[in-house]
A protein has these predicted regions:
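Short glycine-rich, Thr/Ser-proximal phosphate-binding strand/loop in the N-terminal lobe
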Residues: 1-3, 174
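Conserved active-site and cofactor/substrate-binding residues in soluble primary-metabolism enzymes
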Residues: 4-8, 53, 70-74, 124, ...
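Short beta-strand-loop/turn "lid" adjacent to the catalytic site in phosphate-handling enzymes
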Residues: 17, 23-68, 88-90, 96-105
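Buried hydrophobic positions in well-ordered alpha/beta secondary-structure cores of metabolic enzymes
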Residues: 34, 94, 165-166, 212
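A gly/proline- and charged-residue-enriched helix-loop-helix capping module
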Residues: 57-75, 79, 117-121, 125, ...
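A structural motif corresponding to the C-terminal end of an alpha-helix
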Residues: 75-89
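Glycine-rich phosphate-binding loop of actin/hexokinase-like ATP-binding domains
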Residues: 97-200
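A mobile "lid/hinge" subdomain adjacent to the ATP/sugar-phosphate binding pocket shared
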Residues: 200-221
Length: 221
C-alpha cells in the first residue's frame, strides 16, 4: 500500500482501528497513548512525553541521525494531527539504553574539545532491541544477574555488552548507526583514511555518506 505522506498513513491506521466490522475501538478518542520509536535521543536517557521542547531537542540532533530523525519527527507531528488532542504521545530512544556506558567506552581518541563542544562520542543504537533481548534472556534462564552479549541482526546490525545489573557497558555502533558490524547496505567499521582518499578523488561528503550508508555492506561486496 502506497501513502503520499505520514499523515495519510495515520488516517488509514485510524480507519482500520475504528472499522465497524474488524476494528478494535469505536472511536479514536479511545486511543489514550501513542508511542514513537526515535533512533537518536541525544541527551535523553529515558522515555519522554512529547512536548514542543522535546521535539525541538530532537531537531537539534538531526545532524547525528539525518536518515532517521527527520522521518520520526514528521511521524510524530502527523499522529498529533490525526488523533485527538487528548491523546498523549511518548518517545522512546534507540540511544537511551547505551547511556550507561563508561567514558572509556563512549569516548573517541580525538581532541577533547570535539567532545565537550560538539558532543562527538559513541552513542550506540538499537537500544530498545538490546534491552528487550537482555531482559528476555534473564527471564528464560531464570537468572537476573547474567552477563550478556546481545545482537540485533537486520539490515542494520549491532552488538552490545550488558553487565550483571542489566546496564550496557559497550556497543558496536558509535556516533552514528554506520559504525561496527558489516550490515546490509552500511559498511560498518572502516579506516578513516578511506574517507580522506575518496574526498581527494573528488567525492563530496554527501556522496561518501550515500556510498557508506546505501551502497556498501553486503550489497557492496
Amino acid at each position: 500500500m502506497h501513502f503520499p505522506n505520514h499523515e495519510a498513513a495515520f488516517k488509514v491506521i485510524a480507519e482500520y482501528l475504528t472499522d465497524k466490522d474488524f476494528g478494535v475501538i469505536k472511536s479514536t478518542s479511545e486511543v489514550k497513548y501513542i508511542g514513537h520509536r526515535v533512533v537518536h535521543g541525544g541527551k535523553f536517557t529515558t522515555p519522554e512525553r512529547v512536548t514542543p521542547a522535546v521535539v525541538e531537542e530532537l531537531r537539534k540532533v538531526i545532524p547525528l541521525a539525518p536518515l532517521h530523525n527527520p522521518a520520526s519527527i514528521i511521524g510524530i507531528e502527523a499522529a498529533q494531527k490525526i488523533f485527538p488532542k487528548e491523546t498523549e504521545h511518548f518517545v522512546v530512544f534507540d540511544t537511551a539504553f547505551h547511556q550507561t556506558m563508561p567514558e572509556k567506552a563512549f569516548r573517541y581518541a580525538i581532541p577533547n574539545h570535539f567532545y565537550t563542544e560538539d558532543k562527538i562520542r559513541r552513542y550506540g543504537f538499537h537500544g530498545i532491541s538490546h534491552k528487550y533481548v537482555d531482559a528476555r534472556t534473564r527471564r528464560h534462564f531464570n537468572n537476573p544477574h547474567l552477563k550478556n552479549i546481545t545482537l540485533h541482526l537486520g539490515n542494520g546490525a549491532s552488538m552490545a555488552a550488558v553487565n550483571e545489573q542489566g546496564h550496557c557497558i559497550d556497543t558496536s555502533m558509535g556516533f552514528g548507526p554506520n559504525e561496527g558490524m558489516l550490515m546490509g547496505t552500511r559498511c560498518g567499521d572502516i579506516d578513516s583514511a578511506v574517507v580522506f582518499f575518496l574526498g581527494k578523488k573528488g567525492l563530496s561528503n554527501d556522496e561518501i555518506a550515500k556510498i557508506f550508508n546505501h551502497e556498501s555492506g553486503m550489497k557492496g561486496i
